[in-house]
Amino acid sequence: MKFVLIMKICSALSGNCLPEHNGGVHNTWYDCAAAGSLNTLNAMAELGREDVNKRKLFVTFKCDPVIGA
């Protein structure tokens, strides 16, 4: 079974989230979860410490099964 990585950036301050982002299809749950963890770290670095602290930003991800794959 394949899994699609879905990521989202949210603000704990406002309670709002940006639209979900497709992080690609992965062959196993492990691959999807590992990619989600790494992509979360990369997204936080890209957002920057100042913006993350100011807006109380955080990144979430989930791995959804790909139907019919």
Where are these regions (language model features)?
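Short, intrinsically disordered, charge-biased short linear motifs at domain edges
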Residues: 1-3, 17-21, 47-53
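Hydrophobic alpha-helical targeting segments used for export or membrane insertion
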Residues: 2-14
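A short, exposed loop/beta-hairpin motif centered on an aromatic-Gly-Thr core
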Residues: 17-31
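Short, well-ordered alpha-helical segments
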Residues: 28-31, 35-40
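Short, mixed-charge low-complexity intrinsically disordered segments
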Residues: 38, 42-69
